[in-house]
Design a protein with these regions (language model features):
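Residues at secondary-structure transition points
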Residues: 4-7, 24, 45-52, 73, ...
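N-terminal helical cap/lid subdomain that shapes the substrate entry/recognition surface
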Residues: 1-55, 59-64, 77-80
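Asp-based, Mg2+/Mn2+-dependent phosphohydrolase catalytic module
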Residues: 59, 75-77, 81-188
């Protein structure tokens, strides 16, 4: 997972084949991988849904005019799929979403969160990031994000407790007011 989540398709393919892939190989394999992924999501609505209480959390952010965006290493086709599938335009300014365009360094580089903060007109220290991937947490730390919240969706809570940059660990968005609080929550 460490070498797969939050990474560019080029990085994932390079890891999988243990050598530098050609641009043609990256395009072909990435297109096939992403099409399969979207197809799986369409067929498995039970498992392809927003995290529990995410809609309430996003409604709260929107209703309170709290700046928000998405910073993902997914490529444009997947971002468009997510926007349509989850109706994300209800909560996000689509022009401010940051995604892998082939120019942004993949996580754990800080670039994606620096760009997201700039798009929102904020400093990275003024931002809260909710992240599930270890590479994304490292990316947020490297960017100087003020508060990093780990959502334990792919790994057990104990995994995130070992990561010093994590300020808070959640399993869903139920307690969303604590998530956006700049008060740091002690991680035991």
């Amino acid at each position: 997972r460490k070498y797969m989540f939050g990474r560019t398709n080029k990085d994932i393919i390079q890891y999988a084949i243990s050598k530098e892939p050609t641009p043609e190989m990256v395009k072909e394999l990435a297109d096939e991988k992403e099409a399969l992924y979207r197809d799986m999501c369409k067929k498995d609505g039970e498992n392809c849904k927003l995290a529990p209480f995410a809609e309430e959390f996003l409604d709260y952010l929107k209703n309170n005019n709290i700046p928000r965006t998405i910073a993902t290493m997914s490529e444009k086709d997947n971002v468009d799929f997510y926007i349509e599938h989850f109706k994300l335009e209800r909560w996000f300014d689509l022009d401010k979403i940051v995604y892998s365009d082939g120019k942004i360094k993949g996580k754990p580089a800080p670039d994606i969160y620096q760009i997201a903060a700039t798009n929102l007109g904020l400093t990275t220290n003024d931002c809260v990031v909710v992240e599930d991937a270890e590479s994304g947490i490292e990316s947020a730390r490297a960017a100087g994000i003020g508060k990093i919240v780990a959502i334990a969706s792919m790994e057990p809570i104990e995994f995130y407790k070992k990561i010093p940059a994590v300020s808070q660990i959640i399993t869903d968005f139920h307690d969303f007011e604590s998530i956006i609080s700049k008060d740091l929550v002690r991680v035991n």
